[in-house]
Amino acid sequence: MENENRDEMIIKQQREIEREICEAIPLVSQLNEIGSLNDEYENDEVYINKIKDLQTKYRYMRRTRPDGNCFFRAFAFAYLEYLGKNTHDYISFRSLAQESKEKLIKLGFPQFTLEDFHDTFMEVVKKFDPAEISLDKDMTEELSLTFNEQGYSDYVVVYLRLLTSGKLQEEADFYQHFIEGNFTIEEFRHQEVEPMYKESDHIHIIALCSALDVCVRVEYMDRGDGGKIKAHDFPEGKEPKVFLLYRPGHYDILYPNK
Amino acid sequence: MSTPARRRLMRDFKRLQEDPPTGVSGAPTDNNIMIWNAVIFGPHDTPFEDGTFKLTIEFTEEYPNKPPTVRFVSKVFHPNVYADGGICLDILQNRWSPTYDVSAILTSIQSLLSDPNPNSPANSTAAQLYKENRREYEKRVKACVEQSFID
């Protein structure tokens, strides 16, 4: 028995589960009312109260596919949506993104494959130049199309993962303190950051926000007491541009009340 | 039809031709870019020296986000190679990074031949001999090297 190829059997089973999720949930959904969350938590007092609290601050949400890439995908969608309406921030982001390739190559990432991801990433970024977009509605539709096309959507996720990994490497002495278990930064990057479908933790969020110089607010909704959801800004003290809902193991996009 | 996976495989192939790493080669099969044949030459100063080991690499449309399935076609006696030719190597499983290309895959397998990991055995006999009876291990490896000339 021992010499059977168990790795391939496990991989095959994982792929079947993933296929079922793919068929059920789009990569990024249309806008849903926050109230639609109630359907998932019938008769569940704790969550129902927290959804009420969430509604005092947010009106809509977009669900993302729970494939382990949800943080990166949700972040990219929400941030590009913000940038598409904010010329000043868009311009500085675009030049930061443009220059990031050289920086990652200097950190030792393989140039040949990095270029492939960077080219696609920049192609997507350029689509959402506020100067090129006349209507909010057009932009949102274009974002939905782009992010539901697996090729583009996944390449954007990969590039964000590489930026995150690069930041961890660049400031390894700092991030080493946040790593649980016996991982070195090197092992953590290769095992938990760069591979697709690996879930994100605080450390991924902190490193990505720092690499892109942006603040993300995450609203935590779990079984904890108090009936209120808890917000956490990464990093603290800056104005958040991206709003995400966290439920254990998963991130979705939130839209604040205007 | 051009898809991200196919475009990337064309690039991988171009790079492998223009900048071939020592001791490995690979190319898509005649009518399907998703299935490649490859050869790894046994690294010098190892019992695999002089062997020419054939492999197949099968990609899916999810490449490079997911690793391909790589398998030895030639018989290989090695702690991390299964009887069916499947390879137990972390970068082909849970440590796969989309930044790896065909060239990186083949050179990683080549290094695995030189440096087996007997703690995660796919072939328990090979792993045990590697740890406890290196002479017998090398004898068995050399037998598969000779076999590789005939294949």
UniProtKB/Swiss-Prot annotation, chain B:
GO BP annotation list: centrosome cycle; centrosome separation; DNA repair; endocytic recycling; heart development; negative regulation of apoptotic process; negative regulation of DNA damage response, signal transduction by p53 class mediator; negative regulation of ERK1 and ERK2 cascade
Annotated metabolic or biological route of this protein: Protein modification; protein ubiquitination
Classification via PROSITE patterns: UBC_1, UBC_2
Broadest EC class assigned to this enzyme: transferase
CDD domains found in the cross-reference section? UBCc_UBE2A_2B
Deletion: any effect? Lethality during the second instar-early third instar larval stages. Mutants show defective synaptic function as a consequence of mitochondrial failure.
Reaction catalysed by this enzyme: S-ubiquitinyl-[E1 ubiquitin-activating enzyme]-L-cysteine + [E2 ubiquitin-conjugating enzyme]-L-cysteine = [E1 ubiquitin-activating enzyme]-L-cysteine + S-ubiquitinyl-[E2 ubiquitin-conjugating enzyme]-L-cysteine
Q: Which Pfam families match?
A: UQ_con (PF00179)
Which residue intervals define the domain UBC core in the entry? 4-150
Location comes to: Nucleus
* Major localization listed first in the record, in broad terms: nucleus
Keyword Transferase among UniProt keywords: yes
According to its UniProt entry, the function of this protein is described as: E2 ubiquitin-conjugating enzyme that accepts ubiquitin from the ubiquitin-activating enzyme E1 and transfers it to a E3 ubiquitin-protein ligase. Required for postreplication repair of UV-damaged DNA. Involved in the negative regulation of the Ras/MAPK signaling pathway in the wing by acting with the putative E3 ligases poe, Kcmf1 and Ufd4 to mediate the ubiquitination and proteasomal degradation of rl/MAPK. Required for in mitophagy.
Q: What is this protein called?
A: Ubiquitin-conjugating enzyme E2-17 kDa
